[in-house]
Amino acid sequence: MAKEKFERNKPHVNVGTIGHVDHGKTTLTAAISSVLTKTYGGEVKDFAQIDNAPEERERGITINTSHIEYDTPSRHYAHVDCPGHADYVKNMITGAAQMDGAILVVASTDGPMPQTREHILLSRQVGVPFIIVFMNKCDMVDDEELLELVEMEVRELLSEYDFPGDDLPVIQGSALKALEGEPEWEAKILELAEALDTYIPEPERAIDGAFILPIEDVFSISGRGTVVTGRVERGIIKVGEEVEIVGIKDTTKTTCTGVEMFRKLLDEGRAGENCGVLLRGTKREDVERGQVLAAPGSITPHTTFKSEIYVLSKEEGGRHTPFFKGYRPQFYFRTTDVTGTIELPEGVEMVMPGDNVAMTVTLICPIAMDEGLRFAIREGGRTVGAGVVAEIVA
């Protein structure tokens, strides 16, 4: 069977379901797939297919995730759903599935539960920009006031973590009843789809962002100067443009005098492309792997930041023992390792393999970073954890 061509005529948006265990995330995922396919066409995935989440590896970490796709008239959505709480933690911290917005599922029979709070906190830490609430199992609650109470509670909880709790959409529905084809509950799924379309803005494409290229290699070409190579992470670099070399040492400015790809000279290098950039007047020894080439003023170097970390379990090939304050591993950013020290939150004495924890990291030399940057934690080249920059301190 021939592969379907990927249609690029609609904006592509990444979403996912989050929330407490057994509140109905996977059932909702199946219901969205079922109702939208029935309404707008496409291929339906049932509960069993979604629940049987395949294993993926991201930065050496095993994560179970289900990916489904669905369409509304105006957009194409890629949706992730994870079977277990640990999978969510890993998924969100590694950025294995970056979300432009999340659907928080709360069972109206229970109200917010511990993992509801934890997923909201994680969303805040890893930079999920928008949350829409789906109150599930509303068919099992007869008391209108109880539903109002749960909605208030969820809104307050979201506000506590700096999400606009008073303004974000809350849809009251029943994923199971919608899946069983009951029209009044199917309508709620369409209402949720409408909220996705209107509340989550169209994400900026990588190519529209400010130019940045993590440097992987540096060469000297006699008579022409210094060439740095790497994959353009976002934006476009054009010949003749000024760029900054950021990280590890003091920031310097230079000009791009050439772009080449597969030994051909080009006018520009774009997001996603591997290319070599020729730099005017830059010496071979002034540039090194681990620095980035960036649009002037678009990114700055920092040494201290707050982060959210997931520590690999022994089974995942991580540490066999906990670590304590004063732990000094390497932090792998983009293309290089930098040693750093950690500061644990008050009251946390040690961190066990398999835990996730918020910690402050101080690196021995600055790295170009902004909030949301992912990194790995390594000991002698072996990955022992994954993290994300939650807030820059210095």
Swiss-Prot record:
It is found in: Cytoplasm. PROSITE patterns: G_TR_1, G_TR_2. GTP binds at residues 19-26, 81-85, 136-139. Residues 19-26 are annotated as: G1. Mg(2+) binds at residue 26. Its EC number is 3.6.5.3. Pfam families: GTP_EFTU (PF00009), GTP_EFTU_D2 (PF03144), GTP_EFTU_D3 (PF03143). The keyword Magnesium applies. InterPro entries: EF-Tu_GTP-bd (IPR041709), EF-Tu_GTPase (IPR050055), EFTu-like_2 (IPR004161), EFTU_2 (IPR033720), G_TR_CS (IPR031157), P-loop_NTPase (IPR027417), Small_GTP-bd (IPR005225), T_Tr_GTP-bd_dom (IPR000795). One of its GO terms (cellular component) is cytosol. Residues 81-84 are annotated as: G3. The keyword Magnesium applies. Keywords: Cytoplasm, Elongation factor, GTP-binding, Hydrolase, Magnesium, Metal-binding, Nucleotide-binding, Protein biosynthesis. It is an enzyme of class 3 (hydrolase). Its main location: cytoplasm. Residues 10-204 form the tr-type G domain. Residues 136-139 are annotated as: G4. HAMAP family: EF_Tu_B. GTP hydrolase that promotes the GTP-dependent binding of aminoacyl-tRNA to the A-site of ribosomes during protein biosynthesis. Belongs to the TRAFAC class translation factor GTPase superfamily. Classic translation factor GTPase family. EF-Tu/EF-1A subfamily. This is Elongation factor Tu. The gene is tuf.
